[in-house]
Amino acid sequence: MHYNVKEICENYNFEISGVSFIGTPKDESMLFVTNKVKNMISNLIGHRNCLVFVETGIEVPDNLKEDNCILVVDDPQSEYAKLALKIEKSEKENSKNK
């Protein structure tokens, strides 16, 4: 998986190369945070270049926004899944064209 977040968040220019979970986030990954696990948002401290779909209403500290692309949405799990499918489809098409 390789995706430049600039495509959906023009203030950032970095690539994500995989997925992770807010319980154990990884740099350069895509993940989501719902109200159910909002207390884990602090797990992002020290991590960089993550694309994070965060449920509306969750407060995200400014320092996390500096190092990561935070997208506040109503249904983060669904938005995460949609983008993952889009990336997968794009990568399959690119591999066919090689």
Question: Each predicted region: which residue ranges?
Answer:
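Terminal amphipathic alpha-helical/low-complexity segments used for targeting or macromolecular assembly
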Residues: 1-97
